[in-house]
């Protein structure tokens, strides 16, 4: 295919363009929309500094945007996620309501391809009607859409992370067959037992010599919420979030948090990419960057049939 021009809204550090690079797809990012200062630093550490950032999406005039073929919009999950305030997708009022700011861009620029990503709760009882309305809106513009609910661990990544993806194609049928991959890399392949930067929080002598992973969860006990250590048995991490407590490992009887490097690896980044981010973003902010991003390996398997395989050109 010819050069693919891309606009990444709510870009983070640019997982979508990283996935395109992994596939060797000739592309050019013609613009991004991002307001988080650390995400912007990370983006330009990984990508060309010549890519213009149009800033706050609510203030973008679509007439100022260049032409592009692919529009990605992983809008904020703050008001949808069960771990957030769940205040809903409210136009002009909530962070998740920024979804509707994408309308002006889609209507004016009419990109051939759209890719949306958000948390699983978007398909829940509360938000499903709004999600259906959004798909109906896209249909009215001529877009045919295909929805996927995908877990990163089904794509060879040892992280239990389920997300909703919506692929839309203008004036053409959209029918993609995604290839999954069995896990051959596990959490203990990711964790560096010798990393001295790890923050340990407690010691459990009876687990000395054991390797386990899990999370601290708030559980009610005697009328009070207490932090309880819960373990997983499938050698996958819990969903990488913006906070540390959701992922811990037990190394030789000591309970410690995953490091930012390990979190980024579980999001599909390579060592050299992680090092570039670490040079410009403080450690405390790296957890948020990883937690807000998209697993590269999943994006690769969406883009592969969309842009490389027969049936979708």
Regions found by a protein language model. Name each.
Residues 1-313:
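Conserved active-site and SAM-binding loop architecture
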């Amino acid at each position: 295919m010819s050069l693919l021009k891309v606009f990444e809204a709510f870009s983070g550090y640019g997982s979508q363009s990283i996935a395109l690079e992994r596939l060797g797809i000739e592309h050019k990012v013609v613009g991004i929309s991002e307001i988080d200062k650390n995400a912007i630093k990370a983006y330009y550490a990984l990508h060309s500094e010549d890519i213009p950032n149009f800033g706050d999406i609510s203030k973008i005039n679509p007439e100022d945007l260049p032409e592009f073929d692919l529009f990605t919009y992983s809008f904020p999950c703050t008001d949808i996620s069960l771990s957030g305030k769940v205040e809903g997708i409210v136009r002009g009022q909530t962070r998740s309501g920024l979804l509707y700011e994408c309308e002006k861009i889609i209507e004016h620029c009419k990109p051939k391809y759209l890719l949306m990503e958000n948390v699983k709760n978007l398909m829940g009882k509360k938000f499903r009607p709004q999600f259906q309305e959004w798909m109906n809106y896209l249909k009215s513009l001529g877009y045919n859409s295909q929805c996927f609910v995908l877990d990163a661990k089904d794509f060879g990544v040892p992280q239990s992370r389920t997300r909703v993806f919506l692929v839309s194609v203008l004036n053409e049928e959209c029918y993609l067959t995604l290839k999954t991959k069995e896990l051959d890399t596990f959490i203990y392949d990711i964790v560096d037992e010798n990393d001295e930067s790890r923050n340990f929080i407690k010691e459990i002598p009876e687990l000395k010599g054991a390797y386990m992973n899990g999370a601290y969860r708030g559980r009610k006990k005697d009328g009070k919420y207490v932090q309880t250590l819960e373990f997983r048995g499938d050698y996958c991490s819990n969903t990488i979030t913006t906070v540390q407590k959701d992922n811990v490992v037990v190394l030789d009887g000591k309970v410690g948090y995953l490091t930012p490097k390990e979190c980024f690896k579980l999001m599909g980044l390579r060592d050299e990419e992680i090092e570039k981010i670490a040079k410009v973003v403080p450690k405390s902010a790296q957890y948020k960057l990883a937690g807000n991003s998209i697993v590269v390996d999943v994006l690769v398997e969406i883009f592969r049939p969309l842009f490389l395989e027969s049936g979708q050109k």
